Regions:
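N-terminal hydrophobic/helix-forming segments and targeting peptides
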Residues: 1-341
């Protein structure tokens, strides 16, 4: 498959706002795209999008998962100056979103743009830009509307609990894909491309195969319930960690041996390693010191699965992230061969 097909899916997903808890647009995008490919996606009560790729009798099914919820913000309170105090959706330091453009979604359906910044952001006014801690007391969202008071902001329809998405700033330069939310929309785009490849090339699959796109992974319970029946193996497709003492980088596919939840299934992880070596893929086998996946959430919720974790190497996780087309293509090739196995 041409890499541009995969990156187009990734770009479309990245540009579809879906902070965790506010993912309706991404859910609709997935459903529409899978229906175009001739599949019959459905949603469980939680809202995860589940796609039967190869339905057949048997209890040895394979479930591939990715998540489409992303980091974001929520209005904690409206300040006396009309700006917004915020709380984070997912785990990241607020300095990772300093000076980022945002969009605020009211519960009545209105949308406003704004920017995240320090309460006192002018370098010509104080030492705050150099010295201030970055937290929810020292930073705020200023709205692109004329408001100088809590009352004026309330008249806009903005209230506590409104969701806020971050501008992803997607771009590709010399093969490097740079954007927010590559965790995990890069993986979701790869799975969409995989489903397209299976359908268009009539790839023979010898076991039940499902895909699941979760919407609460960033807060820990994305794959905790509502799975299709007959699954024995689950592979979470999620970003690979790039760090100074790990083997993965932005050009590689990453296979995880252990994360914060403990080790992944030995045999299923070895299957991924064997495929990567047979294909002569550039890959890394690593532990992720601060990480949890949908697969680990599933086994912690008493699903009797062998579980594994694989993804493209993503640098600067939970910030302005970067991977490379080579890593995306390697991940795609690994998954094509996994479903044939």
């Amino acid at each position: 498959m041409d890499i541009s097909t995969i990156t187009s899916y990734i770009e479309n997903l990245v540009n579809t706002p879906s902070p965790t808890g506010f993912t309706k647009l991404a859910e609709k995008y997935l459903i529409d795209e899978f229906e175009k490919l001739g599949y019959a996606p459905y949603q469980n009560n939680k809202g995860n999008v589940i796609v039967p790729i190869n339905e057949m009798e048997g209890a040895n099914g394979l479930l591939l998962s990715a998540h489409v919820d992303t980091l974001g913000l929520m209005v904690r309170s409206i300040k006396s100056n009309g700006a917004l105090r915020v709380t984070t959706l997912g785990g990241f330091p607020l300095n990772f979103v300093e000076f980022e453009n945002v969009k605020i979604y009211t519960r009545s359906g209105k949308e406003y743009t704004g920017v995240v910044r320090l309460n006192n952001p002018a370098v010509h006014g104080s030492d705050a830009p150099r010295e201030a801690k970055r937290n929810d007391e020292t930073m705020e969202v200023v709205i692109d509307a004329i408001t100088h008071s809590k009352e004026e902001t309330e008249k806009l329809g903005i209230r506590n609990g409104d969701f806020i998405s971050l501008d992803p700033r997607f771009r590709i330069d010399n093969g490097f894909i740079k954007s927010r939310h590559l965790d995990d929309k890069a993986s979701a785009g790869v799975l969409l491309a995989l489903a397209k490849e299976i359908k268009e090339k009539n790839i023979k699959i010898n076991r039940p195969l499902y895909m699941m796109f979760t919407i609460y992974e960033e807060v820990g319970h994305g794959a905790s319930a509502g799975h299709p029946a007959g699954i024995s193996d689950m592979v979470a497709v999620d970003m690979g960690v790039v760090h100074e003492d790990l083997t993965c980088d932005e050009l590689k596919v990453s296979i995880c041996a252990k994360d914060s939840s403990g080790p992944y299934n030995y045999d299923l992880t070895n299957d991924l390693v064997e495929i990567a070596e047979d294909l002569k893929l550039d890959y890394g086998l690593d532990i992720y010191p601060f990480y949890g996946s949908d697969a680990s959430a599933a086994v912690a919720s008493d699903y009797d699965y062998r579980h594994a974790l694989v993804g493209c190497g993503v640098a600067a996780s939970h910030g302005y992230e970067r991977t490379h087309e080579k890593a995306i293509k390697s991940l795609f090739d690994l998954l094509v061969n996994l479903v044939k196995k």
